[in-house]
Amino acid sequence: MSWQAYVDEHLMCEIEGHHLASAAILGHDGTVWAQSADFPQFKPEEITGIMKDFDEPGHLAPTGMFVATAKYMVIQGEPGAVIRGKKGAGGITIKKTGQALVVGIYDEPMTPGQCNMVVERLGDYLLKQGL
């Protein structure tokens, strides 16, 4: 299966009538492997900050997490594995695998729990595949 198929079929899938606003699979260096049409372009320093937070959980909490200049308040995730952010009525979930970052961005009416489920399910699958 291509990386684009993972985004189209597993991240942008319908959950209880709702979809993520955008999604992508990135390399740890920020290289885009596949993305949905509306996915924002990360700046290199944003990826650096995200990777540092995986290595040093809590690094982003004081400043927030920036994604294409949009600021997300970092909320409880899983240290070293998942970063979650909130911005207004939406948010972001980032799951780290051995080689990739699986990213989902949502807006209402999708819930944070639905976004977490979609992103983390694919991330867990990729981890089991050694990716």
UniProtKB/Swiss-Prot annotation:
**Which PROSITE patterns does its entry note?**
PROFILIN (PS00414)
Record CDD domains: PROF
Query: Which key words tag this protein in UniProt?
Result: Actin-binding, Allergen, Cytoplasm, Cytoskeleton, Disulfide bond, Phosphoprotein
A GO molecular-function descriptor = actin monomer binding
Q: Which InterPro entries match?
A: PFN (IPR048278), PFN_euk (IPR005455), PFN_sf (IPR036140), Profilin_CS (IPR027310)
Q: Which cysteines are joined by disulfide bonds?
A: 13-115
Q: Which GO terms describe its cellular component?
A: cell cortex; cytoskeleton
In its record, the post-translational modification comment is: Phosphorylated by MAP kinases.
Residues modified as Phosphothreonine: 111
Q: Where found in the cell?
A: Cytoplasm, Cytoskeleton
Question: What is the protein's quaternary organization?
Answer: Occurs in many kinds of cells as a complex with monomeric actin in a 1:1 ratio.
Which family does the UniProt entry place this protein in?
Answer: Belongs to the profilin family.
Q: What does this protein do?
A: Binds to actin and affects the structure of the cytoskeleton. At high concentrations, profilin prevents the polymerization of actin, whereas it enhances it at low concentrations.
Q: Extra notes?
A: The variability of the residues taking part of IgE-binding epitopes might be responsible of the difference in cross-reactivity among olive pollen cultivars, and between distantly related pollen species, leading to a variable range of allergy reactions among atopic patients.
Q: What is this protein called?
A: Profilin-4
Q: Which organism is it from?
A: Phleum pratense
